[in-house]
């Protein structure tokens, strides 16, 4: 398995919509394994395929450090909110180093998709896992969490980005 480079803010792949996965083959299994290694190496709780430069609809997550939390992957994810209750909390992104901001997400979502073999999977998630599902699916739609911020938070986040060493290389 391999730790891949995480694409950083400004890379066009991060604002591109990922393609539905139709081939459940060894290359998909390798991608998922590499994504787990990459996420763990970077210290993240989630990673979407386009964050490693691959436009395929798959993400991995690890919320196992939270009571009852899960670790897994989802191919071709689709989610819908359960109820209207929301949660607001600090959110960051491996593709936008040093930036975190208060972001509002649905508290509980129903997720469906497939596993690496094409088998259907589904779950209901709340809290951190719900936030992770929404964040990673946004990535697969080419949407960064900055777009979910209110204008003042977005302006502050962009100021941090513009002042960052990684942005000014």
From Swiss-Prot:
SUPFAM superfamilies: Peptide deformylase. The active site is at residue 136. This is Peptide deformylase 1. InterPro entries: Peptide_deformylase (IPR023635), Peptide_deformylase_sf (IPR036821). Its cofactor is Fe(2+). Pfam families: Pep_deformylase. PANTHER family: PEPTIDE DEFORMYLASE (PTHR10458), PEPTIDE DEFORMYLASE, MITOCHONDRIAL (PTHR10458:SF2). It catalyses: N-terminal N-formyl-L-methionyl-[peptide] + H2O = N-terminal L-methionyl-[peptide] + formate. Fe cation binds at residues 93, 135, 139. The lineage of its organism: Bacteria, Bacillati, Actinomycetota, Actinomycetes, Mycobacteriales. Keywords: Hydrolase, Iron, Metal-binding, Protein biosynthesis. It comes from the Bacteria. Binds 1 Fe(2+) ion. It comes from Corynebacterium efficiens (strain DSM 44549 / YS-314 / AJ 12310 / JCM 11189 / NBRC 100395). Removes the formyl group from the N-terminal Met of newly synthesized proteins. Requires at least a dipeptide for an efficient rate of reaction. N-terminal L-methionine is a prerequisite for activity but the enzyme has broad specificity at other positions. Belongs to the polypeptide deformylase family. One of its GO terms (molecular function) is metal ion binding. GO terms for biological process: co-translational protein modification; translation. Its EC number is 3.5.1.88.
